[in-house]
Amino acid sequence: MKAFTEPLLSLAGFEEMTKTAEKSSGLISVTGCIDAQKSQMIYAFGGHRKNKLIVTFGEQKAKELYDEYSFFDKEVVYYPSKDVLFYQSDIRGNLLTAERIRALKAIREQERVTLVTTFDALMNTCLLYTSDAADE
């Protein structure tokens, strides 16, 4: 994968962005790169980080980013948003529910994980899992 990340490391803008991110904690927002380069940029920028959350504006864009980013990182999962229309959820069956469960399971069980989702899905409420509930 160094063939994809090495060219970025030599760019002054990328180096400055990396230094700024290391000094600060919390959210990192990067804008201005073209769609074809986003997955490569995310991988090079956050490759050393244990967990990554990639949030985008729409369902289609999240799926595209998931497909592209899975080339770089095998520990990537996609968390879809809920269907607003009953018609859409009826067509897909339990696929969205299964994808959500798979993503939540990966977050809970894997040491390293990258989650790709949308703003809508990020705002979904989930029940809190505690180990006490499993004992009952």
Question: Which residues does each predicted region cover?
Answer:
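ASCE RecA-like P-loop NTPase motor cores
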Residues: 1-131
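A short, hydrophobic C-terminal helix/tail in secreted or cell-surface proteins
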Residues: 132-136
